[in-house]
């Protein structure tokens, strides 16, 4: 597990702990959230506990909660790949659509990028987003992400559910981003 502790203004971004599992599960099942991918297979709290243990034992994965004034407003799960250049892959991004405005989410993403660079030397960032989730796509695009590729998924109920990989390659313009 990558250890993450970031606090600024009224935002705190920290690792999920075992005692958070039940609250996290019910947040994931709530319809007040916006998620980067439409499909989440968990149906029981015990399945999330298994996911938690897997992340906890892995040295390159992270599963973090985003708190705003002590309210749980978001979750991010992903992994780091340490190669040249180092990368972060955000595989699950959930945000409460009512607690924070989009501009605050821009700041959260930006501050996480800086944190990952300073703590772990991460230069490049990738996120997978469902092509129908235009709001999340725009949040990441306004943060300097661009479309890298599109994965065509099987149609479900005649709806195209392709996944888009957005990327931000900071190693190309490192001086621009960190000064």
Region annotations inferred by a language model:
Residues 128-129, 144-162:
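Conserved catalytic-core motifs of GNAT/GCN5-like acyltransferases
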Residues 117-128:
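Conserved GNAT acetyl-CoA-binding A-motif
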Residues 101-115, 138, 142:
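Conserved acetyl-CoA-binding loop-helix of GNAT-fold acetyltransferases
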Residues 1-8:
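Short acidic N-proximal helix/loop "leader" segments that mark the beginning
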Residues 18, 29-32, 41-100:
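Acetyl-CoA-dependent GNAT
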Residues 153-179:
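C-terminal "cap" of GNAT-fold acetyltransferases
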Residues 23-26, 47-51, 107, 111-115:
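Alpha-helical elements of Rossmann-like donor-binding domains used by nucleotide-donor carbohydrate transfer enzymes
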Residues 10-26:
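A short beta-loop-alpha structural element at the N-terminal edge
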């Amino acid at each position: 597990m990558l250890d993450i502790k970031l606090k600024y203004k009224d935002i705190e971004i920290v690792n999920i702990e075992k005692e958070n599992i039940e609250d996290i599960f019910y947040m994931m099942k709530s319809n007040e959230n916006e998620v980067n991918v439409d499909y989440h297979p968990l149906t029981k709290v015990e399945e999330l506990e298994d996911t938690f243990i897997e992340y906890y034992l892995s040295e390159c994965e992270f599963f973090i909660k985003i708190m705003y004034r002590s309210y749980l407003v978001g979750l991010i799960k992903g992994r780091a790949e340490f190669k040249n250049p180092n990368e972060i892959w955000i595989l699950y991004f959930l945000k409460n659509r009512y607690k924070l405005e989009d501009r605050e989410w821009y700041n959260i993403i930006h501050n996480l990028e800086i944190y990952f660079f300073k703590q772990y030397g991460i230069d490049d960032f990738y996120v997978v987003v469902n092509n129908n989730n235009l709001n999340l796509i725009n949040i990441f695009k306004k943060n300097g992400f661009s479309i890298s590729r599109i994965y065509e998924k099987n149609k479900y109920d005649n709806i195209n559910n392709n996944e888009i990989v957005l990327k931000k390659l900071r190693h190309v313009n490192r001086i621009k981003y960190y000064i």
